[in-house]
């Protein structure tokens, strides 16, 4: 985002995406997923070693970003990116689905929750800030080894529509 490190963009369906721990690699350290013109996810792997030793948990972190909030920061340098709780610019999506778990071991996937999926139908759900489903699920989140995470990504999955069936006599 601010040229801190290299991103690989996920835009097509792919399996076994390889993601080494952020502090343990000289290759790709995060994936970028475009959700809309202005919104995106950043996916990174954090391991409790080196500068991350004192993290409350480890695993895959999913950040939700909004260029409408981030771009003004680049020009004004005013730290207002997350000043409005209902309209934040860059924030974590905790695996627990509870925003209060950001600073706990329930934040990373699978982490203490054991949550291995982030889809339109999970908690937390893969949605835009306005609640629109993304159709871009991240599934089968798992450890490949001690410091590498693997996951599957699907692109532009159609939304599931359900009809209500009523029975009358």
Give names to the regions the model predicted.
Residues 158-166:
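Proline-enriched interdomain boundary motifs that mark the N-terminal boundary
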């Amino acid at each position: 985002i601010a040229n801190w490190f290299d991103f690989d963009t996920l835009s097509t369906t792919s399996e076994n995406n390889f993601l080494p721990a952020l502090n343990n690699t000289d290759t790709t350290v995060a994936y970028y997923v475009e959700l809309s013109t202005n919104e995106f996810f950043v996916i990174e792997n954090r391991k409790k070693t080196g500068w991350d030793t004192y993290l409350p948990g480890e695993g895959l972190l999913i950040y939700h970003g909004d260029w409408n909030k981030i771009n003004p920061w680049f020009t004004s340098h005013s730290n207002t990116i997350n000043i409005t709780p209902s309209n934040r610019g860059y924030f974590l999506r905790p695996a627990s689905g509870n925003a209060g778990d950001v600073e706990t071991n329930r934040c990373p996937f699978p982490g203490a929750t054991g949550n291995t999926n982030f889809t339109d139908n999970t908690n937390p759900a893969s949605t835009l800030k306005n609640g629109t489903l993304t159709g871009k699920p991240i599934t089968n989140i798992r450890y490949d080894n001690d410091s590498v995470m693997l996951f599957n990504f699907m692109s532009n999955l159609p939304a599931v529509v359900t009809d209500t069936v009523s029975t009358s006599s």
